[in-house]
């Protein structure tokens, strides 16, 4: 019985280790006035992944194919931006950084009709935003227009001047409330 209890305890303690981890530091909280975000994608399926998306220009009316981050399942199309920025990892050429921590949620609230999952939204925003505020605006506008196809996520947005934190969760199709909340991290 003692052995079984020990095994169950170890298994339960290991569960939190499956979550991604972000640490956010605002300009006023760092000694030298730097904004810092650390992001550990604790997913065993993404170790070693380093995304690279070169800056590009596209013809007006071009459509962007959306595939679910990870499994690669086709979700739909959205209009492509005419100009995109260079992205390496989770940062773009304007030093906009986006990270995430998955916390889940009720499966019945994941919108099965939605086109954009959290990973697609992160990389689309990095390709299109010059500031953290602009990334949040793009993220929320696209999620409102095309639906959010993931469970609960805490999204970290940063640029050289600000750091923001936003929670978002899926909503049933045609559910009338927005499933998100954002806050700016305090200066100090």
Show the residue positions of the predicted features:
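Sec-dependent signal peptide recognition
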Residues: 2-10
């Amino acid at each position: 019985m003692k052995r079984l209890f020990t095994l169950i305890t170890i298994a339960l303690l290991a569960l939190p280790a499956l979550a991604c981890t972000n640490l956010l530091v605002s300009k006023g909280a760092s000694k030298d006035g730097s904004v810092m975000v650390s992001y550990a994608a604790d997913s065993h399926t993404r170790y070693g992944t380093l995304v690279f998306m070169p800056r590009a220009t596209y013809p007006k009316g071009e459509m962007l194919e959306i595939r679910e981050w990870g499994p690669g399942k086709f979700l739909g199309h959205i209009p492509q931006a005419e100009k995109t920025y260079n992205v390496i990892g989770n940062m773009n050429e304007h030093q906009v950084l986006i990270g995430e921590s998955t916390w889940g949620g009720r499966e019945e609230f994941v919108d099965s009709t939605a086109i954009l999952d959290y990973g697609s939204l992160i990389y689309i925003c990095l390709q299109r935003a010059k500031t953290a505020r602009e990334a949040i605006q793009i993220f929320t506008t696209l999620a409102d227009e095309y639906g959010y196809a993931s469970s609960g996520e805490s999204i970290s947005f940063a640029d050289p001047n600000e750091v923001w934190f936003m929670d978002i969760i899926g909503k049933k199709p045609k559910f009338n409330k927005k499933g998100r909340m954002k806050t700016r991290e305090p200066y100090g």
